[in-house]
């Protein structure tokens, strides 16, 4: 084993547990934060990178570009998941947050359509694909990292994945409220929309550093590298795979209602931008506070080892997300 695959003793102290939660959840929070920022400021971004005579067409193209990132997610999930099974959870997590930071940096510094023409939307698409690729492998790898470090409290520790998304939503919507209420439309379109992306860019290196301070999970060190993780998945775990896809698809679809909420309020209801963002803040606060309590309940009602395996694969833990609906 290399130094990177040396396991630390079980992290049972309060400080060690918090460090584990922060290190594991920071990437998940960053990816959801960046997704929300793009979705929340879609109206502005559409004018900067996808100008069209019809604003509705411009917005649809912007949201379509947002959807392109989902095409890269399965590829990223397969690649980074298999990479984590071979090289370790820590290696996969440091790689995913590095790729996410690069994608966020591209959005922060991206020149407008007025500056570079057609190159601008092409670069936006490239940034979304990179972001989607890294996000695809982040959630499962970081959840496995948490659960494998603390299998005795798997429900509680894994619940912070959803709670961190709520916190990310609070920060993103906070930026939305402040910027839309405190800046003119011209300033927001000129440079103000870049501020929340720049904030996300600052989080990335911090998360990368924190993750490098943690050791590999005891479970991975004990089991060793998997030589054919994809073959094992499709042959031996196909039933769990199908169940996971269905459960995550159902729960994730509800999550993106939160992303579209401000845009819907602006375009369809003709409400001020701040109103849509305020509604999103309330939903995010509920998610942040409620989900860890559901995680505690999950640990209390757990009665079998098979629950742990299901938890790692994600299809039972997906019920935690329903707590914020």
Residue spans for each PLM region:
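Glycine-rich segments within core transmembrane alpha-helices of 12-TM secondary carriers
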Residues: 134, 154-180, 203
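Cytoplasmic membrane-interface "Motif A"-like loop-to-helix N-cap segments
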Residues: 86-98, 300-314
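Helix-to-loop junctions at the C-terminal end of transmembrane segments
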Residues: 75-89, 291-303
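Extracytoplasmic gate region of multi-pass secondary transporters
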Residues: 38-39, 238-287
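C-terminal ends and interior cores of transmembrane alpha-helices
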Residues: 51, 98-117, 313-325
């Amino acid at each position: 084993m290399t130094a990177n695959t040396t396991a630390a003793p079980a992290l049972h102290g309060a400080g060690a547990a918090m460090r584990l939660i922060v290190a594991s959840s920071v990437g998940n929070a960053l990816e959801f934060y960046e997704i929300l920022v793009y979705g929340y400021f879609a109206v502005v971004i559409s004018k900067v990178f996808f100008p069209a005579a019809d604003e509705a067409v411009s917005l649809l193209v912007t949201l379509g570009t947002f959807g392109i990132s989902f095409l890269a997610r399965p590829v990223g999930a397969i690649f980074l998941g298999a990479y984590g099974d071979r090289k370790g959870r820590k290696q996969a997590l440091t790689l995913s947050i590095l790729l996410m930071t690069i994608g966020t940096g591209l959005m922060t510094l991206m020149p407008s359509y007025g500056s570079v023409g057609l190159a601008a939307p092409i670069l936006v698409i490239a940034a979304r694909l990179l972001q989607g690729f890294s996000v695809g492998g982040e959630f499962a790898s970081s959840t496995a990292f948490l659960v494998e470090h603390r299998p005795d409290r798997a429900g509680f520790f894994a619940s912070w994945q959803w709670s961190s998304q709520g916190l990310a939503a609070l920060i993103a919507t906070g930026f939305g409220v402040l910027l839309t209420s405190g800046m003119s439309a011209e300033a927001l379109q000129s440079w103000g929309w870049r501020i929340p992306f720049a904030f996300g860019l600052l989080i990335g290196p911090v998360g990368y550093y924190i993750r490098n301070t943690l050791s590999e999970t005891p479970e991975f060190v004990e089991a060793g590298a998997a030589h054919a993780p994809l073959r094992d998945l499709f042959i031996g775990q196909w039933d769990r795979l199908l169940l996971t896809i269905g459960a995550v698809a159902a729960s994730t679809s509800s999550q993106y209602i939160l992303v579209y909420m401000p845009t819907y309020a602006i375009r369809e209801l003709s409400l001020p931008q701040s109103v849509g963002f305020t509604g999103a803040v309330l939903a995010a606060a509920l998610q942040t506070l409620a989900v860890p309590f559901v995680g505690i309940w999950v640990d209390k009602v757990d009665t079998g080892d098979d629950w742990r395996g299901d938890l790692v694969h994600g299809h039972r833990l997906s019920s935690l997300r329903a707590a914020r609906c």
